[in-house]
Amino acid sequence: MATPYISMAGIGKSFGPVHALKSVNLTVYPGEIHALLGENGAGKSTLMKVLSGIHEPTKGTITINNISYNKLDHKLAAQLGIGIIYQELSVIDELTVLENLYIGRHLTKKICGVNIIDWREMRVRAAMMLLRVGLKVDLDEKVANLSISHKQMLEIAKTLMLDAKVIIMDEPTSSLTNKEVDYLFLIMNQLRKEGTAIVYISHKLAEIRRICDRYTVMKDGSSVCSGIVSDVSNDDIVRLMVGRELQNRFNAMKENVSNLAHETVFEVRNVTSRDRKKVRDISFSVCRGEILGFAGLVGSGRTELMNCLFGVDKRAGGEIRLNGKDISPRSPLDAVKKGMAYITESRRDNGFFPNFSIAQNMAISRSLKDGGYKGAMGLFHEVDEQRTAENQRELLALKCHSVNQNITELSGGNQQKVLISKWLCCCPEVIIFDEPTRGIDVGAKAEIYKVMRQLADDGKVILMVSSELPEIITVCDRIAVFCEGRLTQILTNRDDMSEEEIMAWALPQE
């Protein structure tokens, strides 16, 4: 076999105490399309950021074109022919096609001893590159006027302008129509014939089988298997992705389903988002005291649905009912007043006020629900604020020196407890947890699970979004699986709640 252009051996990457990559091996040959597979959080994106020079590895060796490196920076990686195209495209809509192709690297020529931009030469080279990728657009066209497919071709052209030998593509078909996917694959096949290697990250197994030559599967920050795509079945790939270790990964195990009567109190009927690609025709019901989990791949529509339910995003249709009444929130404030709470996946961006104390953060949501108190800015009087905070501190076993200390001084797990307590002050009936244990340690996770189960036992309806399959299997009574904006299955039988079964419903079938 030919000499590999890239060989990554024993790559590790730590962020403080968190080992994002443990020991990863990856080999990519010239003229091959190599699938990089794995669950959410397996380490695929981190590995590609190491290869493209964005992250410095903690250990391991990267060999490119027979030269070994302990680390790369972004500039060196580009010089060595490593290009990356992210799922969120980096082209700038306000600039023209030509300007996007030459951002930060204009060609120049000397006239009378002065360097000036050589627009003529740039146009000639740009036209040749667009011809190479089959992109028929005017160089002076604003990128904002291009389709998603054309923007993607422009990204490929930008990468090739840097003489890329390896192109990393992260979920490149996520926003493309079937016809546009066909066109992308046509260009990829042409690049393969020219000797360009492509690392292809995707969860769409039908696409992997159609376009890729070899594969590497990652799990929990390690590479577990590599081989030829035609030698394995889709079931084999799914088993490699999820492994064999299931419910026992966490110490905190879910006890029996709540003893509360199976009384349906929360219903979602035919909810569709205004952007119909995000959420389409979703219906389900939840009983009092039940934890309903939402599983699926990144971009499957879970968080988008929660935003619709809580009034963050507008709905095109559908109804949300609580205790038999249509509550369909028009805004987050309306949702709070109607008995809902939302603990978002981003604590720092959407969850807490970093300049406020623990007590002040706890007081915010109740102030909003009740329309304000007599204190300044509509918050509690200080005495009420302190009393409530101390009660919540004891209830949730919050570890802090004082409820008056700044919330940013707490660990991630304790910050999450503050967010939970903030919403408990509103006495909600429905609580949405979106990635409730992201970024916190195993011990803190167990405490959060315990809190969620206590809330369910108290009669609350819990909606839990999580990308960690062992977690969602452990904690939830039932699991709703999403794929590409649709609810594909609700798993109710404990025997069916395996990682393999969830992934089978979460992966696109076409």
Curated annotation (Swiss-Prot):
Matches recorded under NCBIfam families: PRK09700.1 (NF007253)
Recorded catalytic activity of this chain's protein: D-allose(out) + ATP + H2O = D-allose(in) + ADP + phosphate + H(+)
Species of origin: Escherichia coli (strain K12)
CDD domains tied to this protein: ABC_Carb_Monos_I, ABC_Carb_Monos_II
GO cellular component, one term: membrane
Record Pfam families: ABC_tran
Gene3D superfamilies cross-referenced by the UniProt entry: P-loop containing nucleotide triphosphate hydrolases
Subunit structure: The complex is composed of two ATP-binding proteins (AlsA), two transmembrane proteins (AlsC) and a solute-binding protein (AlsB).
Gene that encodes it: alsA
Record key words, sorted: ATP-binding, Cell inner membrane, Cell membrane, Membrane, Nucleotide-binding, Repeat, Sugar transport, Translocase, Transport
Name by which UniProt lists this protein: D-allose import ATP-binding protein AlsA
Function: Part of the ABC transporter complex AlsBAC involved in D-allose import. Probably responsible for energy coupling to the transport system.
SUPFAM superfamilies: P-loop containing nucleoside triphosphate hydrolases (SSF52540)
Binding site for ATP: G38, E39, N40, G41, A42, G43, K44, S45
Main localization, broad class: membrane
Subcellular location: Cell inner membrane
EC code(s) of this entry: 7.5.2.8
Highest taxon above the source species: Bacteria
